[in-house]
């Protein structure tokens, strides 16, 4: 392979579905073309929202070939805020401001609005991934200088990518999430038997309260999610944000679009009072994992969030033999429900030498605190001790 050529493109449509998915695949719902294009097409990732597409496309030709083929892609956005990232750098932005400098724009490689780890740099088997990463890094440094961008942030890459990017000079950061693992359970009751008596009783009590209220649940696979479901779901979705004085990042058109373009990776769990939907949660899935992402309800019903978003999701994983369940960022209340702490990763390059050193020192100091937090969280897990 020789004559590598890198382009920054302002729309994933410039690369195209076949080309992008040819490298990225479709198993990860948040990095497949359909998801990223739906965000862009419906106005969720645009310059006005602070997520301007700036995707990376690398082309190369084999010695005997006359034309160049796409050999690598990477999602990239030029950002003018830090919303929808879930790796928090607001304090860094404030520090820049205190010194009369601008932290924005910055570059971010991520699945927008999605705190879920996965591959971020997709390469053809004919090229060396480290070489491609180095090329992107070099070109991005040049682009950052020309656009006066402060930094580049790679959010929720795999552990292997985190190490690769760190090796070429992009600082590494860790954080913690809580995921549930399906250890070949045949039923939810079998899972409960792995918990200590007190936690098992607490979960049963919570579920019993929901049942006594007469609430029932229905799982709607993606192809069967109709306009009426999207309407009520979107009302709930926005109400969740409104309670915090915010507006949801995503439009109803976005949800309708992914419902059309990738229904096989979606399912919705709705809670019913008689025939009336009183809550809804939208999940994604791939061949091994479920991802709980968005939820809302008509009002605050005790334990309904836990049932709809966690217990129903766990039951779905058991029934469909999915190996794990990523229910989103944060949430220490998940620990007592069997969600285990896992490490997540990010990488950060800072253009300003002074700030780069300060942030590097911060990351070094932060890492043992994250490890200690993860250990403490693991010590609180409700599983029975092996005798």
Question: What are the functions of these language-model segments?
Answer:
Residues 1-387:
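N-acyltransferase acceptor-side catalytic subdomain
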């Amino acid at each position: 392979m020789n004559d590598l050529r890198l382009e920054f493109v302002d729309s994933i449509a410039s690369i195209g579905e076949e080309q992008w998915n040819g490298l990225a695949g479709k198993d990860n719902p948040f990095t497949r073309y359909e998801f990223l294009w739906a965000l862009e097409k419906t106005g969720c990732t645009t310059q006005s929202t602070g997520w301007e597409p700036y995707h990376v496309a690398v082309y190369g030709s084999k010695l005997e070939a006359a034309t160049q083929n796409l050999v690598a892609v990477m999602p990239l956005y030029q950002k003018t805020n830090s919303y929808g990232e879930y790796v928090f750098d607001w304090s860094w932005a404030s520090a820049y401001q205190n010194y009369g400098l601008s932290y924005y724009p910055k570059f971010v490689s991520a699945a927008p609005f999605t705190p879920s780890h996965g591959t971020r740099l997709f390469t053809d088997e004919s090229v060396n991934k480290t070489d491609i990463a180095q090329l992107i890094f070099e070109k991005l440094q040049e682009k950052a200088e020309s656009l006066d961008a402060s930094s580049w942030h790679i959010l929720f890459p795999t552990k292997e990518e985190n190490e690769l990017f760190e090796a070429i000079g992009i600082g590494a950061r860790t954080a913690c999430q809580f995921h549930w693992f399906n250890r070949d359970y045949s039923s939810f009751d079998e899972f409960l038997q792995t918990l200590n008596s007190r936690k098992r009783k607490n979960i049963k009590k919570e579920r019993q309260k929901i049942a006594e209220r007469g609430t029932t649940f229905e799982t709607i696979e993606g192809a069967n999610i109709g306009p009426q479901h999207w309407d009520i779901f979107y009302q709930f979705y926005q109400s969740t944000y409104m309670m915090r004085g915010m507006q949801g990042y995503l439009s109803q058109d976005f949800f309708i679009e992914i419902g059309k373009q990738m229904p096989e990776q979606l399912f919705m769990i709705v809670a019913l009072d008689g025939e009336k939907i009183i809550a809804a949660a939208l999940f994604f899935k791939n061949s091994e994992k479920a991802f709980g992402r968005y939820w809302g309800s008509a009002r605050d019903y005790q334990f309904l969030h836990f049932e709809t978003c966690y217990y129903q999701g766990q039951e779905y994983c058991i029934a469909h033999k999915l190996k794990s369940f990523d229910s989103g960022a944060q949430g220490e209340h998940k620990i007592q429900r069997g969600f285990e702490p896992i490490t997540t990763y990010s990488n950060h390059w800072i253009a300003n030498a002074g700030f780069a050193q300060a942030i590097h020192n911060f990351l070094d100091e932060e890492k043992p605190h994250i490890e200690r937090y993860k250990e403490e969280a693991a010590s609180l897990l409700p599983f029975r001790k092996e005798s």
